[in-house]
Swiss-Prot record:
Annotated coiled-coil segments of the chain: none
Oligomeric and partner information: Component of the RIX1 complex, composed of ipi1, rix1/ipi2 and crb3/ipi3 in a 1:2:2 stoichiometry. The complex interacts (via rix1) with mdn1 (via its hexameric AAA ATPase ring) and the pre-60S ribosome particles.
InterPro entries: ARM-like, ARM-type_fold, Ipi1_N
Keyword Phosphoprotein in annotation: no
Family designation: Belongs to the IPI1/TEX10 family.
Alphabetically ordered keywords of this record: Nucleus, Ribosome biogenesis, rRNA processing
UniProt xrefs under Pfam families: Ipi1_N
Subcellular location: Nucleus
Chain's role: Component of the RIX1 complex required for processing of ITS2 sequences from 35S pre-rRNA.
BP term (GO), one: rRNA processing
Name the record gives this protein: Pre-rRNA-processing protein ipi1
Entry superkingdom: Eukaryota
GO CC annotations, alphabetized: heterochromatin; nucleus; rixosome complex
Length: 413
């Protein structure tokens, strides 16, 4: 009898239980009741916590980090909108320009190579507003980042990016001219010249010029800007007058009163000449001293002179309207003024140095004589035009200086 009860008990585990009508299934032994409800607790001081200063600062920092991250968004419209919001944010939080200058320029400079023209235009407006607000001591160490992407844009495979690159270079040149020391442009001198070589098409090995640029009556505004920015760059690096002005406007910390107050230790004289510490290069000129001088810049551009002179000649021939056919364009006079400015710079440099080779002088003299003949025709055909009167005045100054330097022999012929 006992065995039958045990057998029934074992089979009961596998039998399907038949429930009576109206009764629910029995709850298991490990059942947990979850039918209870919770109530929220509201503190009377909870609203005051959201208005504290540390929460506002944290929100601003998070918003700024969010904007910087959105600069890499895949959508061009989103990148443009982010730049506009970032502009408004920096205008309302100008301390960002002091505390996060390197980070800001590091993340915005790559947009120079952005495929969207609207993003590049928005970036140009952004840099145009803030590059003159940043302190020179903060801008100069970080301006190389903008130069890096500008050089990449000048040699970019996309024509639209290539055309917009000189807009950013013009901003950098104006910043270096007005607020920074000459070393800022000297460190970028060689690379920028190489980029202009590819952009404008002059050859560094010979006097041949790739006719990739044409400044005729149908010349584009982009190529005119390339030529104008190139002239500004050369003037800033080679013109002695601009260099003297640049040194006056740059930031140099001078303390003349220290010369009267400093007491020199007697053993200091032992370290004024290179001795056992020579391997440390403590007494050698640094990189800025080596490149920040007109001699270095002239030696760098020297191999490019034949190609540049030929480029100047071709640009003048393309833009100069020697025949009055009614198709004169305002862009032609701008090109001619810029060409005369560039030619005057190289005339001053080549003819003021006694040991310059004769072939460079001959090429410049030939270009001057050609321009002198064309100027006579311009005076006859367009002498009453205000735009061309500026060209005629510019040539008169160049002619006077060329005669002083014996660069223009027999100017009447």
């Amino acid at each position: 009898m006992g065995k039958s009860k045990k057998a029934k008990a074992k089979r009961a585990d596998f039998n399907k239980q038949k429930l009576k009508v109206g009764k629910s299934k029995n709850a298991p032994n490990n059942f947990t009741d979850t039918s209870f409800r919770t109530k929220t607790l509201v503190l009377p001081t909870q609203a005051a916590l959201e208005k504290e200063d540390f929460n506002t600062t944290a929100k601003d920092q998070a918003y700024f980090a969010h904007l910087l991250g959105m600069l890499k968004h895949h959508n061009a419209n989103q990148r443009q909108e982010t730049l506009e919001k970032l502009t408004q944010y920096v205008l309302s939080h100008t301390s960002i320009l002091t505390t996060s200058t390197a980070l800001l320029l590091k993340l915005t400079s790559p947009l120079i190579l952005d495929e969207s023209s609207s993003v590049r235009d928005c970036l140009y407006r952004f840099l145009e507003k803030f590059i003159y607000i940043m302190g020179p001591e903060l801008l100069e160490p970080n301006i190389g980042m903008i130069f890096l992407y500008t050089h990449s844009g000048m040699t970019h495979i996309t024509p639209s990016i290539r055309n917009d690159s000189t807009k950013f270079l013009s901003l950098l040149i104006n910043a270096c001219k007005d607020r920074l020391s000459s070393s800022a442009i000297s460190l970028q001198w060689k690379k920028t010249l190489e980029c202009f070589t590819n952009l404008l098409g002059w050859n560094s090995e010979s006097a041949s010029v790739k006719r990739t640029t044409s400044f005729s009556k149908k010349s584009s505004a982009n190529m005119i800007r390339h030529l104008t920015v190139c002239n500004d760059f050369l003037q800033l690096g080679l013109n002695p007058k601009l260099q003297a002005k640049n040194q006056q406007s740059s930031v140099h910390l001078k303390y003349p009163y220290l010369q009267q107050c400093i007491v020199i230790h007697p053993k200091y004289e032992a370290f004024r000449s290179p001795c056992s510490f020579a391997y440390l290069s403590l007494f050698n000129p640094n990189k800025h001293d080596l490149v920040d001088n007109p001699t270095f810049r002239w030696q760098t551009i020297y191999p490019l002179i034949p190609g540049i002179i030929e480029f100047i000649r071709n640009s003048w021939s393309d833009a100069c309207p020697v025949v009055k056919d009614g198709s004169n364009s305002p862009s032609a006079s701008k090109v001619c003024r810029t060409v005369l400015s560039m030619l005057g710079l190289f005339t001053e440099q080549v003819f003021s140095v006694a040991d310059e080779p004769n072939n460079h002088r001959k090429k410049i003299s030939q270009v001057l004589r050609k321009i002198n003949r064309d100027i006579e025709l311009i005076n006859i055909n367009y002498g009453t035009d205000s735009e061309w009167r500026g060209v005629l005045k510019g040539y008169d100054k160049l002619r006077e200086r060329a005669v002083e330097l014996d660069a223009l022999e027999n100017p009447g012929k």
